[in-house]
């Protein structure tokens, strides 16, 4: 009976695991899943914990160190005179408790604590930066899948139209209203449209596979994205001003905070290097005792009787260090200048990125508005030409050209629409740090 029970439990567990994984994913579900399971992010979170341990260690360096030592020795004298009252075997033990405390080191340890805290913060910012990169990759893939998915529908509609034209052309050929060459051209066009549809479906599968890889899903898992119902309206939403996005991004983005911390670390590194010229004051103290056999005194009596203690202070004043301190200070100043240049470069790169997002969003939104009108015009023109073709008033070339114009208009509408959606998403993300859900 145990095997059937085990099989039922395993099946129930598998069913539950499968039920927890959706087959149709929203943008937010993709982001949440990736942020939880991405290896780079999880590795970064471990690095944060490691940096926190370093910070605790640097803070503990302010405290005195304490150590306990004990030494035990056994002795043996095999040729001792038999008339002696002393034992041939002897034992001695030493016990010591020692403490060391650096009272002053030019504030080096304080500076090290500050640097450790900054490194800790930078480790967290690295996780945030990687998180942002992953979210940008996800939204790009998600929008690309939406675009190709709708493109597949367009190609399917075009193929359906071509097949209808083949059927009508076949009827016209039977009654002598269409030549064999024109019918062959209609059939060739239908075959081309079918090829384009298959190609679009293949591209869609490739992007879905990339998304599965990014989400760390099994390649055989069912996966599709939730198609928003209001994407047309969202593509026509107001575009946030580039200056407003830049101001928010410069204050919020982790790469800018990283660059600012690098500058602060550079300044503190100069202070640390200068401590090489500072004197160091340290205190040392200890207490100890010892015991031995052969003295006629018990171990318990020897412990307090032999107790001894010491207390000392060490003052270390650097006089000449073969220019090592000066070299360290100069190199720290150069590193600070490099950090300032990197911050300037990061600022400029971020500004150019946001400006590029804004230009792409604005341009493609205008293209989308124009493309919507072009699709309506091309659709009306094609339907009119189709009717005229059936009446024998238009030839096959004019019909094919009209269909090509319609397809190009539809593709232009889709491309501009989803490109606008992508850059609108990125602008909002750089402004407030959140991806807006597609409705």
Kindly label every feature range from the protein language model.
Residues 32-42, 49-65, 96-115, 125-132, ...:
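A glycine-/polar-enriched beta->alpha junction
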Residues 53, 133-248, 360, 364, ...:
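Periplasmic alpha-helical coiled-coil/stalk elements that build and connect Gram-negative outer-membrane
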Residues 4-13:
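Sec-dependent N-terminal signal peptides
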Residues 6, 18-21, 76, 211, ...:
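Acidic, low-complexity, intrinsically disordered peripheral segments
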Residues 117, 180-189, 330, 396-404:
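Short, charged, amphipathic alpha-helical segments
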Residues 21-23, 69-101, 228-239, 271, ...:
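Small/polar, glycine/serine/threonine/aspartate-rich low-complexity segments that form flexible
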Residues 43-58, 130, 134-154, 171, ...:
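Amphipathic alpha-helical coiled-coil segments
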Residues 18-71, 219, 225-264, 318, ...:
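Bacterial Sec-pathway N-terminal export signals of envelope proteins
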């Amino acid at each position: 009976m145990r095997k059937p029970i085990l099989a039922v439990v395993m099946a129930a567990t598998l069913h539950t695991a499968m039920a927890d994984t959706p087959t149709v994913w929203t943008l937010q579900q993709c982001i949440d899943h990736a942020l939880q399971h991405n290896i780079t992010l999880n590795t970064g979170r471990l690095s944060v914990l490691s940096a926190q341990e370093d910070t605790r260690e640097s803070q503990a360096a302010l405290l005195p160190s304490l150590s306990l030592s004990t030494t035990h020795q056994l002795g043996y004298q095999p040729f001792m005179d038999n008339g002696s009252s002393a034992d041939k075997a002897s034992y001695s033990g030493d016990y010591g408790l020692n403490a060391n405390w650096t009272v002053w080191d030019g504030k080096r340890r304080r500076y090290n604590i500050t640097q450790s805290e900054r490194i800790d913060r930078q480790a967290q910012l690295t996780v945030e930066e990687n998180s942002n990169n992953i979210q940008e990759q996800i939204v790009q893939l998600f929008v690309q899948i939406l675009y190709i998915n709708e493109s597949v529908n367009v190609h399917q509609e075009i193929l359906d139209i071509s097949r209808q034209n083949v059927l009508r052309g076949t009827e016209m050929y039977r009654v002598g209203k269409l030549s064999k060459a024109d019918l062959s051209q209609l059939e060739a066009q239908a075959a081309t449209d079918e090829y384009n549809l298959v190609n679009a479906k293949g591209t869609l599968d490739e992007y879905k596979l990339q998304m599965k890889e990014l989400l760390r899903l099994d390649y055989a898992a069912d996966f599709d994205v939730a198609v928003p119902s209001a994407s047309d309206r969202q593509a026509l939403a107001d575009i946030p001003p580039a200056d407003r996005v830049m101001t928010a991004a410069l204050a919020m983005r982790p790469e800018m905070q990283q660059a600012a911390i690098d500058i602060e670390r550079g300044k503190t590194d100069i202070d640390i290097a200068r401590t090489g010229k500072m004197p160091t004051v340290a205190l040392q103290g200890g207490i100890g005792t010892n015991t031995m056999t052969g003295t006629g005194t018990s171990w318990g009596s020897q412990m307090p009787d032999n107790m001894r203690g010491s207390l000392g202070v060490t003052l270390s004043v650097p006089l000449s260090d073969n220019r090592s301190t000066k070299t360290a200070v100069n190199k720290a100043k150069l590193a600070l200048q490099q950090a300032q240049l990197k911050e300037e470069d990061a600022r400029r790169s971020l500004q150019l990125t946001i400006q590029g997002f804004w230009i792409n969003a604005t341009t493609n939104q205008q293209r989308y508005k124009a493309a919507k009108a072009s699709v309506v015009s091309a659709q009306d023109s094609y339907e009119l030409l189709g009717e005229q073709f059936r009446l024998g008033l238009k030839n096959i070339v004019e019909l094919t050209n009209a269909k090509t114009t319609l397809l190009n208009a539809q593709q232009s509408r889709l491309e501009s629409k989803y490109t606008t959606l992508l850059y609108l998403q990125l602008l909002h993300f750089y402004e407030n740090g959140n991806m807006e859900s597609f409705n």
